[in-house]
Amino acid sequence: MLEKYYDKDADMSAISSKTIAVIGYGSQGRGQALNLKDSGLKVIIGLRPGKSWDLAKSEGFEVMDVANAAKKADIIQILIPDEQQGAVYKTQIAQGLTKGKTLMFSHGFNIHFGQIVPPADVDVIMVAPKGPGHMVRRTYTEGKGVPALIAIHQDVSGNGKKTALAYAKGIGATRAVVFETSFREETETDLFGEQAVLCGGMTSLIKAGFETLVEAGYAPEMAYLEVLHETKLIVDLIYEGGFTKMRNSISNTAQFGDLTRGPRVIGQESYLAMQEILEEIQTGAFAKEWMLENMVNRPVFNALTRADEEHLIEEVGKEIRATMPQFKDLK
């Protein structure tokens, strides 16, 4: 079982005298930086000029270019997209990452797959909130927190875990729970979850169900409501109480269909595909494919994204959501 940590296990004094540079001010960067600042820690923001620069300044941060932030900071937390981190590290961070500093991540991709190779005289740690940046911020302001993972890749100082736990406390994660894992385990399980279940698996399952009903002559609106709109209702029940709560909340007819038909949809063929996907992650084949895709301006990524944006389910979804009051204020 994974080790668990809470507020009582974390001491903010481990980083209270240090300067933390948050590189990036997107969803995670903004959420983490604001929480750290509100926890009384010294935070600077490393960015290139643009809207995020102006936003960070307006929210009370000292903002500078990435290279200067890396030089000035004791702890450097990289919170820009995975595919950008390697180049930014080499050109703007590495020179300022001097002996005794701490390099941080919220996802292990670039360390685990060798896109970033830090010097041997720095600590390399991870604090990975298990929720988007706006949720990290919102729960903090409510006096709660989002669970997080910590991992230690290099612990030259001997204080890597203390630093990670203190940072996790600074963003509010120890108010919930913090689990200790490894860079390898976090990276591989995170990618697998995204590809096979949460994003890739779910969207493909929904599209297949939608297409099956539409091709059989059912109204696209009915297909959308049955295979996409109601997904949230079921997922929320599973999230709150596992499969048991979900099954206790649906009809006996639905539960019988779930138990007898579900394994026919996700059967041996799907299981074998999941094993293959996991192997591609473990061997680095997926990481290589993704890095190469970015080097040639993402032709596959862009084509597949456009195709899904033009799918009938998206058109129908926009029309249906426009009729529902709960979606009026959502962007």
Curated annotation (Swiss-Prot):
Organism: Methanospirillum hungatei JF-1 (strain ATCC 27890 / DSM 864 / NBRC 100397 / JF-1)
Active site per database record: 107
Pathway participation: Amino-acid biosynthesis; L-isoleucine biosynthesis; L-isoleucine from 2-oxobutanoate: step 2/4; Amino-acid biosynthesis; L-valine biosynthesis; L-valine from pyruvate: step 2/4
Comment on bound cofactor: Binds 2 magnesium ions per subunit.
Cofactor(s) this protein requires: Mg(2+)
Binding sites annotated in the UniProt record for NADP(+): 25-28, 48, 52, 82-85, 133
Family, similarity comment: Belongs to the ketol-acid reductoisomerase family.
Cellular component GO terms held in the UniProt record: cytosol
One Pfam family in the UniProt entry: KARI_C
Domain KARI C-terminal knotted: 182-327
General function of this protein: Involved in the biosynthesis of branched-chain amino acids (BCAA). Catalyzes an alkyl-migration followed by a ketol-acid reduction of (S)-2-acetolactate (S2AL) to yield (R)-2,3-dihydroxy-isovalerate. In the isomerase reaction, S2AL is rearranged via a Mg-dependent methyl migration to produce 3-hydroxy-3-methyl-2-ketobutyrate (HMKB). In the reductase reaction, this 2-ketoacid undergoes a metal-dependent reduction by NADPH to yield (R)-2,3-dihydroxy-isovalerate.
Residues where Mg(2+) 1 binds: 190, 194
Superkingdom, taxonomy of origin: Archaea
Reactions this protein catalyses: (2R)-2,3-dihydroxy-3-methylbutanoate + NADP(+) = (2S)-2-acetolactate + NADPH + H(+); (2R,3R)-2,3-dihydroxy-3-methylpentanoate + NADP(+) = (S)-2-ethyl-2-hydroxy-3-oxobutanoate + NADPH + H(+)
NCBIfam families for the chain: ilvC, PRK05479.1, PRK13403.1
Record keywords, A-Z: Amino-acid biosynthesis, Branched-chain amino acid biosynthesis, Magnesium, Metal-binding, NADP, Oxidoreductase
Molecular function (Gene Ontology), one example: ketol-acid reductoisomerase activity
Any Gene Ontology biological process: L-valine biosynthetic process
Name listed for the protein in its UniProt record: Ketol-acid reductoisomerase (NADP(+))
EC number: 1.1.1.86
